[in-house]
Each structure stands twice: as structure tokens, then as C-alpha cells.
Amino acid sequence: MEVRYKRKVDLCFRPPRTVRAELSRPYGILFSNNAKLLSYLGQFERIITVGDVVTSLVTRSGIRPFLSVVDGKTRRNVSISGERSSEVITNEAGILRFSAMSKIKEIMYGREPRSLFVNGEDDMMVIPIILYGKNGDLVVYGQPNAGAVCLENWEGSRWRVMDIFSKFTAELC
């Protein structure tokens, strides 16, 4: 008889207080005009959206993101959006779970468009999307009280995100 112990362990990566200010600033082009944002998106083949408002705006305009990530909340309040996502992941506020990063890696290396619903908070999902994305991907995420940020993925953006992520501390969830 063979016995295997398959304990499932998840790591949580937490940013130090000094990095939180870095995470709150926009990286990329900030759009406060929806028409200009949607026009800009036309230049890109693979678009990834993070956030309920941005995802709703993009999909209502007829653009199908390669990956859309939502958490059912807008500014920490429950959203009125009824959109259902195909897969659910868990990621609590203020952290980045290894399991969430692994799911995003799987999707970003795949070929099929997908959507994720985050049980928790979607803000940190931009980090693995940039780390595992392809050159030329466009990540669109909401910037509270300002608009939407478009960040094109390339070696420089990956380097910057990796620099920020390297300052996180890991702990068991």
C-alpha cells in the first residue's frame, strides 16, 4: 500500500509599508477620457483588464480581453455588476497569493481568452500579469478617482515589477 501526504500549502507575499506608496501610483498612461482610452486599445492584440469598472467599460465597447480579472467590488464596495467569471481564485486584500499567481501564469501562457473572479481583492493581480505576460500585451487597470491606466508589457515594465515584487516578504497563508 502506498500512502501519500498531499498537504496543500499556499504562500502569501506581502508588500512592506515602504512599497505600498509605490503600488498606489499609476505606471503607464493614465486615461481620464473613455473615448480616448478605447481608441488607444485598438492598437493592441492582447488586452488584459484588471478591475470591475475597466473590464465593464472595455467589454461593453465590444472588445474581448484576453484576460479579465474582477472582484465584484468597486472602491471596496460591492459592485452592481452581474458579470460572472469562468474561474474563481482567492486573494485577500493587501497580499498576493502564490496560488493566484500560478493560475495567472497558466492563463498567460495559454491561448484561450479567460476571465477570473477574485474572491478577495484584484488589485495585486497586475504583478503576475506583467511578470508572465508577453511583450506587447496591454494591461488596463483602474486608478481610483483618476481613470484607467494602460501599461504595455515589455522588458522594462517586467524589470520594474520584478524590482517591486522582490521587496515583498513571503509567509504561509
Curated annotation (Swiss-Prot):
The Swiss-Prot or TrEMBL record annotates one GO molecular function as: kinase activity
**What is catalysed by this protein?**
3'-dephospho-CoA + GTP = GDP + CoA + H(+)
- InterPro entries listed in its UniProt record: GTP-dep_dephospho-CoA_kin
Among Pfam families, the record links this protein to: DUF359 (PF04019)
GO biological process annotation, one example: coenzyme A biosynthetic process
EC number of the protein: 2.7.1.237
> What pathway or pathways are given for this protein in its record?
Cofactor biosynthesis; coenzyme A biosynthesis
Q: Where does GTP bind?
A: 52-54, 71, 73, 122
Q: Which UniProt keywords apply?
A: Coenzyme A biosynthesis, GTP-binding, Kinase, Nucleotide-binding, Transferase
* Record keyword Nucleotide-binding present: yes
State the similarity comment.
Answer: Belongs to the GTP-dependent DPCK family.
Q: What does this protein do?
A: Catalyzes the GTP-dependent phosphorylation of the 3'-hydroxyl group of dephosphocoenzyme A to form coenzyme A (CoA).
Protein name as it appears in the record: GTP-dependent dephospho-CoA kinase
Query: What is the source species?
Result: Metallosphaera sedula (strain ATCC 51363 / DSM 5348 / JCM 9185 / NBRC 15509 / TH2)
Q: What is the lineage of its organism?
A: Archaea, Thermoproteota, Thermoprotei, Sulfolobales, Sulfolobaceae
